[in-house]
Every structure is written in C-alpha cells, then in structure tokens.
C-alpha cells in the first residue's frame, strides 16, 4: 500500500440486508432481501467512501474493495492466498531473456457496456497509464504504477526513473504482447494489483477518465468514469452512488464466469469502529473488517462468525539513524534486547498473532531461520548500552493517535509497554504523538521522527514488496544509506530464478537484522466478523475478496 495508505490496511467492512432488518449474530432470522435467492442483497459497511472507482488513481482499501467486484486484471491471486492465477488472461509466457511477455486472453468476454474485451483493450489501458501526465504521475495518485513500473513515457518529475513498461502490442484479438525495458521478477505478481484492472476503452474515453483536478497532495477526482460509469468485466456492475450514504453494485448477469450468488452488494460507510460493531449487533449490518481484539471474544460468544486473514503484515519500531544516537549499533541493539515483544503480543493482540523476527511474514519465500532474534534480555541490553558510550541516553519515541491498524490496533498501548521496557534498562523516553494523517506520517516520512511505531501490509506475494519497499532506496525515515543492502535487494529483484531469489532473500534478511534498522515485533491475522447467515466469504492476505462467492443462508 502507498506511503500514506500502505499502512492503511483495508478498513472495516459490513454487510446489511437492503430494505429490511438484517440477521443478528447467532439467530437464524432473515429479511426477505437477505435470502440466498436471486434477489438477495448484501450491504457492506465500510469505514469510508471510495476516493474514486477508477482503479488507476487509488491506493486505499476502501476504494479497491468495490473496484475488485467491478473490474478484473489479466491475473489475480488464488482465493485465500498469494499465488498468481489466471483472470482475464488464461495463460502467459515470458521470453527466455525475460523482456517479452505474451498473454493469451479469454475469448468471448465483454465489458459491462457490451463492448468486446480483447488485446487492443488491454494495450489501450496500459498505454493510458504509461502516458499519464502532470499530477497523474505523482505517487499519491499513481502509486502502484510507480511501484511496479517506475516511470512514464515522458517523466514530468526528474526523480522518476526509466519505466519498466515499454510497449504493448495486440498480436491478434486474443494475444497481448508486452515489451519490458529489463527483466523483472515482480512484473507478473505486480499485475495482480487492482490498480491494473482492465476498463472499457469506450467508457474511459466517453466519460473523461483522465479528467482530474486539484493538486498532487489534494487531487479532485471528478470524472464521470470514476464516479458514475466505471465499466469493467467483473461479476458486479455499478448501479448508484450517494456519497456518505451508500454505493450499490448489482449482479452482472452477462458475466463470463460463474455468476454472482447475490443480486446486489451495498457498501455503506460507517466511519467509527465502535459504530460498525454496534451496527452489526443491532442487525443494521451483517459483518465488518478489522475487528478490535477486545471485541472478538464478545462477538464469538454472541454467535457471530470470526474469520481471520492469513498474516501478511509486520508491525515494527523504526530507527532514524540520521538522529544520534540511533546511528550507534550497540545502542540500537540495546533497544532491541530491552523490548519484551512476547509479552506485548500476548497481552495486546488477538489469538494468532506472532512475534516477528524480520521485516517480512514467515509465510513468504525468502524468510530466514538464521536471523538474529534479539530475544528479551534486559541484562544484555544494559551491557550493550554501557558499551555504546552514550551518556544520559534519551530517545524521542513517536506514536500515532486516532488510528487503528491490523499490526497496531492500539498504538498508545504499544508505546506505553515499550516505554516501560526501555526505561527499565536506563533509556529515558520522551513521548511524541500526532494524528495519523497527515501529521504523523509526514513527521516519520520526512525524517523528523527519531524512533517510531509503524507497519506495513503487503500488496502482493513477493519479498520485494516488504523489504524492498523499506530498504531498496534511501529513505528519510530510516536515515541511512547501506549500499550493500540496496545493491543486494536490487540484484534479488531482477533475478528470475525462484530458487536463487529465495536464497538471496534469506541472506538479505540476515543482513538486515544484523544491521538492525529497526525492530519488527508482530505479524497479525486481521479478523472479520459476520452474521451467522453469511456464507462463502474467503479472507485473503491481500484483500482479494470476492463477494460473488457469498450467499445469505
């Protein structure tokens, strides 16, 4: 997820039966609209409205959630996992040198405006993104294009690099051939992102998709395509959108694959987490995402379903080495040994959370079993602190307010626990807090924070999306420039042999944790709560969750 919203893991969702009272938790009551028949409807309470329904312009979960129902990409991820599987492309083949990729497309697929999906449509979409101009190129708007492809046909920002994307050719209606500027091991997995969903070229042109106002920091998404006519190939199509009230999708009866079981899905914004829980309990909604750890037991006892996503995140303490004494290796190690991460995870996180030993989840290839683990050892922390030569050790420790994340449901509680650990070994802590966005993120990302709580939820199943995101370039929040780590990460990124990449990433994880730019402390399994009658929802580590599979019993 993006620098601003990459840590904004998909926010809470809920489902509400339209036009009548919805089910309670363990009860079997249901409204006429919450049956499993062809007229069933699901109202899904979200934490916020989408920014826009043009997938190319967004990087937040609340926008991507309905986008995933309307649009599809060439490839997607396996339900419940991160393996790449076919979507609009049935198969693909890279050339021996990794420069050319040929995608064989599904036949007989149509967009929701009844125009044909074909190779020309695929190339139109990629060429549209490649030719973005002005504020369209900013990372706040085209974050995922910048992440996967790194540049445009003509870069308006000199900081942008050469694009990985070179061209797309429609060899025939069912064959799209991509040319890259260099081999890339992350190209295919990057295409699973909803940002690369294929839209109807006719609709993009007719409804002025490239119409965008405002500034890079405060864009205005006013095009009719993104607000009223988003046209894709997915199992649901756009029906209506009343901002701050509800977004309604209806079943696409002309869908090329298995038809959706539900007639409609309705996304209803409920900003407050307690409000979403109360709405579930009152029967106003039927489920929501990112259940607070303290609510799980209560909801289970009341008969609600609790579903967990596989762990695909990391919570960590970051050190800014540009602010002494964080540049002192012994001092950083002293902090690591002082932190009782096991106690925090057991006390403050739901069942299934585990202590992190590195900056990527253990389920991802390249995780190492030989990293330094810095197990809780206050005596060793005191020795390292003495060896550091730092007199009167003091740190400014930042934590965010007004936010809850899967890896950090209660930032203040984490801060207090870690503060006590540090002071117990003789490190004085100066608390620094700020609202999450924009103040806290700005302070961290600009390099103003000395030590801070942060985290990351992965976008796709590749180590480069974790440790590459953090350390493949020099970033102010870390305040160091370790060229060995950067070079090793770049080498692993372009390596196309999976066995070699796995070995390389294991070594890099060892290297990172020896260098110790921060202390990863938790991987969590975000929980969703649903009423008993909601069936078929498959939690995904990357939030690739399809409502077309859901039924109401």
Predicted regions mapped to residue ranges:
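Append "and occasionally in soluble cytosolic enzymes with long acidic Gly/Pro-rich linkers
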Residues: 239, 251, 327-420, 424, ...
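C-terminal motif of bacterial Sec signal peptides marking the signal peptidase cleavage site
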Residues: 19-22
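Aromatic- and charge-enriched surface segment that lines or borders ligand/interaction sites
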Residues: 90-141, 177, 325
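Detector for C-terminal structural segments
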Residues: 242, 338-366, 410-419, 439-553
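N-terminal lobe/hinge region of extracytoplasmic solute-binding protein
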Residues: 45-96, 127, 231-232
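Ligand-site clamp/hinge motif
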Residues: 224-227, 241-243, 248, 252-298, ...
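Gly/Pro-rich hinge or "lid" segments in bacterial periplasmic/extracellular proteins
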Residues: 79, 183-186, 192-258, 264
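Surface-exposed binding/hinge segments that line
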Residues: 138-212
